[in-house]
């Protein structure tokens, strides 16, 4: 957890009142932070305050005081002004940076901005340095992910450039040094420096070093190690140039957003920021000539439901109208949609808010954890999906089927080509998330190291066929089943753009019969445990005057599927809801050949969650 230094005089100035230490300690505790220590430097009182590691907006005095001020009810309407906020305006002011094609994936990205007319003094100077270092340590993972350089704008000859330069061509005077250092000697020069030696390993194996240079050829910084001495900021600096190089563009944008949003309170006009344009070379490996205007002050909107808020927070008497003043204390604006729904406008500097649960956490903090009425907790209640899974498992085991557990990852070729299938488009909004969807677009593994593990499975059948292939030499018939999760993408219909579903797959293989009758019998057996019967079984029992459940039932609907023999495959449809929750059939010989299987195979696969959701209505 990062700890920041807050001078009492800064606290008084920014909060607009003097708060005694005991009261401040209570406020911090309620807000979810802690006064770790109190130090004195002469007559100056300094609070050491520990803040959450994911709240990058609180790692500076400006952000912390702004948040506490709002929390105690002193609301301030902060409105940021982005000046020169277009590519044309930036080019006119020479506020742009060219990224050379030599810049590779080891430090691919750069984000920049300009702050002008900064009212600099000793406290502001120290706050800038501390904010920079806290972002380096936490967000930047000790400069591995990103490194920030803050320069005296007036000493720079714009525009600037970012490139990887040959070591022998690098010559500059580093920060707080008096002698010129060449790139060939750079590592040796700093290997005994107690503050910088731990960062040298980041670039020690680079053939070329990353540098940012101005139009006059002056090296401004050699990230992620050090800036030049010529552009260092002092108490007399009035204009700031901020640059952040990174291997993750999103994190670099977060860092620059935090710096600009916090330090712009010292600018004239207040909260004004000058935009900066970054243009990548057309041969740049990652960006291919893209251009970006920074900083990106873009809020995001989330829609929340009161049932979820009450369930997660435990505040059972909370109404939708109570939410707005609570979130206002946390500097988040909200809007009521109806009696059960509201939207929130998440500030761009709150990168920690990624899900509805983060909004609920802020509501609970504003409400006060001490004000939430405790309830007796029900311990060791079995999850309904787990209970359902266990029931299926027991039934199949009693029917002499052996359970297997296979990998959740596999190759695209196996999941689709070997099954003679093609997945649906990633932007297909017609996919019903409540149904059985083996053709849904898969979740892909980024930068997969092996072709065997490229995607997350969308069906259990593929790995079951691989398992049969590996065990075809054993005594026949083979009876296996697997209960496991599949995943597929959802195109903006869920907060993670993907969904997990619990599937059951049953496979039967024998030399003398395809086993479709056996598979059909197993389907009836497992669904009977849920009092779920087929339409023909209900009709048959009614003729015998035997009462069985008939309000919910399933029927087998013939279909065509290239993975199965024609006229030997059916959809399993849940009625009267008309939800397809599974498939049953005999695997096509071509598919069996693809998996090196030389005996007939029948399979069942069902979406357990579809059944469970309907029966629990």
UniProtKB/Swiss-Prot annotation:
Q: Which GO terms describe its biological process?
A: phenylalanyl-tRNA aminoacylation; protein heterotetramerization
The B5 domain is annotated at: 297-374
Q: Care to name a GO molecular-function term for this sequence?
A: magnesium ion binding
> What GO CC annotations are associated with the protein?
cytoplasm; cytosol; phenylalanine-tRNA ligase complex
What general EC class does the enzyme of this chain belong to?
A: ligase
Q: What cofactor does this protein call for?
A: Mg(2+)
The EC designation for this entry is: 6.1.1.20
Q: Does the keyword Lipid metabolism apply?
A: no
Q: Which is an annotated Pfam family here?
A: PhetRS_B1
Where does the UniProt annotation locate this protein? Cytoplasm, Cytosol
Q: What modulates its activity? A: Inhibited by bicyclic azetidine BRD1389, which competes for L-phenylalanine.
The question of whether Cell wall biogenesis/degradation is a record keyword is answered with: no
State where Mg(2+) binds: 352, 358, 361-362
Alphabetic keyword roster: Aminoacyl-tRNA synthetase, ATP-binding, Cytoplasm, Ligase, Magnesium, Metal-binding, Nucleotide-binding, Protein biosynthesis
**Superkingdom, natural source:** Eukaryota
Q: Oligomeric state and partners? A: Heterotetramer; dimer of two heterodimers formed by alpha and beta subunits.
Its family remark reads:
Belongs to the phenylalanyl-tRNA synthetase beta subunit family. Type 2 subfamily.
Protein name from the UniProt record? Phenylalanine--tRNA ligase beta subunit
Whose protein is this, by species?
Answer: Plasmodium vivax (strain Salvador I)
What does the record give as the organism's lineage?
Answer: Eukaryota, Sar, Alveolata, Apicomplexa, Aconoidasida
């Amino acid at each position: 957890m990062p700890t920041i230094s807050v001078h009492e005089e800064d606290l008084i100035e920014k909060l607009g009142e003097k708060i005694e230490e005991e009261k401040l300690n209570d406020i911090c505790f309620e807000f979810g932070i802690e006064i770790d220590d109190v130090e004195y430097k002469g007559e100056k009182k300094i609070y050491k305050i520990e803040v959450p590691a994911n709240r990058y907006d609180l790692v500076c005095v400006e952000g912390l005081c702004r948040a506490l001020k709002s929390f105690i009810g002193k609301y301030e309407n902060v409105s940021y002004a982005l000046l020169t906020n277009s590519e044309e305006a930036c080019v006119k002011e020479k506020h742009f940076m060219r990224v050379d094609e030599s810049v590779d994936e080891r430090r691919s990205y750069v984000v920049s901005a300009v702050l002008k007319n900064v009212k600099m003094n000793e406290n502001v100077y120290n706050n800038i340095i501390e904010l920079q270092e806290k972002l380096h340590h936490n967000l930047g993972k000790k400069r591995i992910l990103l490194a920030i350089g803050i320069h005296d704008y007036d000493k720079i000859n714009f525009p600037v450039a970012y490139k990887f330069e040959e070591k022998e061509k690098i010559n500059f005077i580093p920060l707080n040094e008096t002698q010129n250092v060449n790139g060939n000697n750079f590592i040796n020069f700093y290997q005994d420096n107690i503050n910088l030696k731990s960062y040298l390993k980041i670039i020690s194996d680079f053939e070329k070093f990353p540098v940012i240079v101005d139009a006059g050829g002056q090296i401004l910084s050699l990230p992620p190690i050090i800036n030049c001495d010529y552009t260092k900021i002092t108490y007399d600096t009035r204009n700031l140039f901020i640059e952040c190089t990174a291997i993750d563009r999103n994190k670099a944008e977060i860092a620059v957003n935090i710096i600009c949003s916090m330090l712009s309170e010292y600018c004239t006009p207040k909260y004004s920021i000058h935009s900066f344009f970054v243009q990548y070379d057309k041969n740049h490996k990652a960006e291919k000539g893209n251009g970006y205007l920074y900083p990106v002050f873009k809020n995001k909107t989330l829609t929340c439901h009161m049932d979820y808020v009450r369930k997660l927070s435990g505040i059972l008497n909370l109404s939708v109208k109570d939410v707005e003043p609570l979130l206002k204390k946390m500097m988040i604006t909200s809007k009521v949609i109806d009696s059960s729904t509201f939207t929130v406008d998440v500030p761009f500097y709150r990168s920690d808010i990624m899900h509805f649960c983060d909004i609920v956490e802020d509501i609970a903090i504003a409400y006060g954890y001490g004000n939430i009425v405790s309830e007796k907790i029900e311990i060791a209640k079995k999850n309904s999906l787990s209970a359902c899974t266990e029931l299926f498992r027991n039934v199949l085991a009693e029917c002499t089927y052996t359970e297997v557990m296979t990998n959740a990852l596999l190759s695209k070729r196996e999941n689709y080509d070997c099954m003679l299938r093609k997945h649906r488009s990633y932007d297909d909004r017609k996919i019903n998330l409540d149904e059985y969807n083996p053709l849904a677009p898969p979740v892909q593994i980024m930068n997969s190291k092996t072709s065997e593990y490229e995607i997350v499975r969308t069906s259990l059948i593929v790995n079951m066929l691989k398992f049969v292939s590996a065990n075809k030499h054993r005594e026949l018939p083979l009876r296996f089943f697997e209960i496991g999760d599949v995943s597929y993408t959802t195109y903006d219909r869920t907060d993670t753009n993907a969904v997990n579903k619990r599937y059951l797959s049953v496979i039967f293989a024998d030399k003398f019969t395809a086993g479709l009758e056996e598979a059909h019998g197993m389907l009836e057996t497992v669904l009977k445990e849920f009092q779920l019967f087929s339409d023909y079984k209900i009709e048959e029992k009614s003729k015998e005057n035997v009462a069985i459940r008939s309000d919910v039932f399933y029927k087998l609907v013939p279909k065509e599927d290239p993975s199965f023999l024609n006229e030997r495959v059916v959809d399993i449809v849940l009625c009267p809801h008309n939800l397809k929750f599974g498939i049953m059939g005999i695997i096509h010989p071509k598919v069996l050949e693809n998996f090196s299987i030389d005996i007939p195979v029948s399979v069942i696969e069902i979406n357990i969650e579809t059944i469970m959701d309907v029966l629990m209505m």
